[in-house]
């Protein structure tokens, strides 16, 4: 098969592992920077070009689109879809998952466990917003943030009011969530592929930090999931319309709650913590499903 990996980072661990796994299984792999692509949107023969040359036909695409280029990256992916190319995650699923508020609304509608979440526009609504999520401590999140950036723990009501007023003054889109104290600074990353969780790790925040992201110094260890956690992760990925997803859960007193569904989960942390060949599993999944899509 000829496989395209949409990525700006050929040197990144996840991209390199996917290339290695695909080549080891005899596939022709190309890393394509979506920002270098331009498109001919044509009802008869849609095409994608780079530097004056039309790209050849691909059998499958693996999107590794960074959050900062979601709009253009999704447009390029849509063009591949128009050309009949199999994509492990489609443009609609990626767009859904990148919109944190929309994600929460979709998951809530499906009855999937979530932290109590509030959203407002006017500073005059701040007192009600704080009460809505159970008061302080609470978590304030920038809707556009990634890797723990733009996530603030407000430990007192006064701090929460100050942070919310500051963000609203900057016209930033934010949401407020209850603080799940019993999680003790740990979350669980479930790696969902199709209708299975193929790997899972517990991420523990470093001392003095509440964000467990590995980019912020958190540590990862193998974890055993409960049946409810496994089911929640699979349902969350399916709700977003994603075949491949990193679903982040917290263990709360009322069961697992979903914090985020990531459409482009990194492989380095999960492969190191679980010693599983996740990259190979992804390529195997593509082989099976790309061929199914053709038949």
From Swiss-Prot:
Tell me which residues bind Mg(2+) 1: 248, 260
Q: Which residues form the ATP-grasp domain?
A: 104-287
GO MF term set: ATP binding; metal ion binding; ribosomal S6-glutamic acid ligase activity
Residues at which ATP binds: 141, 178-179, 187, 211-213
The record's listing under InterPro entries reads: ATP-grasp, ATP-grasp_RimK-type, ATP_grasp_subdomain_1, RimK, Rimk_N, Rp_bS6_RimK/Lys_biosynth_LsyX
Q: Where does Mn(2+) 1 bind?
A: 248, 260
What this protein needs as a cofactor is:
Mg(2+); Mn(2+)
Q: Looking at the UniProt record for this protein, which Gene Ontology cellular component terms does it annotate, in alphabetical order?
A: cytoplasm
| Main enzyme class | ligase
The residues the record assigns to binding Mg(2+) 2 are 260, 262
E.C. number, please?
6.3.2.-
Q: Which Pfam families match?
A: RimK, Rimk_N
Return the SUPFAM superfamilies for the record.
Answer: Glutathione synthetase ATP-binding domain-like
Q: Which residues of the sequence carry a binding annotation for Mn(2+) 2?
A: 260, 262
HAMAP family from the UniProt entry: RimK
Query: Of which family is this protein a member?
Result: Belongs to the RimK family.
- Protein name from the UniProt record: Probable alpha-L-glutamate ligase 1
């Amino acid at each position: 098969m000829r496989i395209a990996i949409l990525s700006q980072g050929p040197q990144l661990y996840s991209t390199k592992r996917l290339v290695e796994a695909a080549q080891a299984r005899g596939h022709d792999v190309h890393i394509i920077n979506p920002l270098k692509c331009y498109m001919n949107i044509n009802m008869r023969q849609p095409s994608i070009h780079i530097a004056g040359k039309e790209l050849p036909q691909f059998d499958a695409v693996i999107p590794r689109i960074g959050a900062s280029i979601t709009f253009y990256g999704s447009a390029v992916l849509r063009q591949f879809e128009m050309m009949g190319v199999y994509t492990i995650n489609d443009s609609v699923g990626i767009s859904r998952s990148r919109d944190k508020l929309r994600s929460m609304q979709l998951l809530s509608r499906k009855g999937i466990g979530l932290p109590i979440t509030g959203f407002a526009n006017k500073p005059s609504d701040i007192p009600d917003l704080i009460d809505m999520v159970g008061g302080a401590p609470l978590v304030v999140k920038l809707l556009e943030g990634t890797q723990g950036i733009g996530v603030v723990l407000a430990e007192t009501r006064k701090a929460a009011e100050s942070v919310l007023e500051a963000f609203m003054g900057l016209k930033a889109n934010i949401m407020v969530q209850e603080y799940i104290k019993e999680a003790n600074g740990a979350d669980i990353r479930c790696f969902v592929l199709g209708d299975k969780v193929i790997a899972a790790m517990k991420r523990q925040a470093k001392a003095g930090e509440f964000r467990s992201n590995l980019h912020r110094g958190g540590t990862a260890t193998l974890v055993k999931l409960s049946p409810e956690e496994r089911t929640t992760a699979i349902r969350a990925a399916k709700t977003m319309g994603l075949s491949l997803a990193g679903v982040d859960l917290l263990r709360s007193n009322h069961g697992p709650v979903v914090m985020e569904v990531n459409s482009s989960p990194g492989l380095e942390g999960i492969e190191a913590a679980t010693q599983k060949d996740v990259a190979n599993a992804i390529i195997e999944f593509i082989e099976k499903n790309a061929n199914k899509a053709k038949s």
